[in-house]
Amino acid sequence: MKTKTILKTILMCLGVSAMSFATHIKDVQAVTEVYGDGEKLSTVILTYDQMIKGDSVSKDDYSVPNRTVKKAYVNNTAQKSNTSKKRGKYVIVELEELPLEDTSMDMNPQDEEERKKRNEKGVSGPTLGGKGNAKPLENITAQITQKGTVVTSNGKKYGADSTVLNSSNTRQLVIEDFVQLTFTDKDGKTLMYNLYKPKNYNPQKKYPLVVFMHDAGAVSSEHKYTLSQGNGATAWASPEWQKKHESFVLAPQYEVVTVNDKYEYGPELD
């Protein structure tokens, strides 16, 4: 009996807010979007165990490491909205867009060695058949802390806590709408590609086909690299564009450099 009493006292001393915070936030989801310079974290979505009052939530209630919170609001679905709902189980935390990155000087060690060899031979630009200089795709996640108090629809307060919560899953907006496929020719050679099909596809209709071919900087063995490295492909599959111009979007993913600066090309281009 004494043991139970002592344990209860210890838990009370630790603070009710810390326990309720961990208990009442049931899930943290990271959401990415693709910008001109690549895929980045844009939103964090919190799922609570009770309806949260919309007027009890503000951007100052949440903190994301190394990012600025643009706005925070309540929704009744796990997605962004133009307006906050009066109540909902989801708190949407939108982040300020990061400044554009200059990736022109990014170089993998192997590619730096290749570049030196080319310079010694007086050759500039990508080497035909080379592997390019693409970095491995980053697994984007999110961390978030609730630093303010939010209120449930029945008046219960969920207090602030310094606990840092990690995302359990990541949504890749627009990227997730592409399917990954591989083409195999009669000689057994393969080419990876990503394909977007209009959401309201009607086999009785004809649709335009947009083809996006990445440059040597995105040469990679990772199937979705061309979708993540910049918005050259995803821009055409965005809801805004598709609403006006329904179309298929095809984005091949080359594993080697297919054309060099002398306009010489390899068999992959065929």
Segments from the language model and where they lie:
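Short, flexible loop/turn elements at secondary-structure junctions
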Residues: 3, 182-185, 197-199, 215-217, ...
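A domain-start/cap signature at the N-terminus of enzymes
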Residues: 22-45, 66-207
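Bacterial N-terminal signal peptides that target proteins for export
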Residues: 1-10
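A mature extracytoplasmic/lumenal domain signature
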Residues: 50, 97, 253-256
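Active-site machinery of serine-nucleophile hydrolases
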Residues: 209, 213-269
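Bacterial N-terminal signal peptides
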Residues: 9-18
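A short glycine/threonine-centered beta-strand motif
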Residues: 40-57
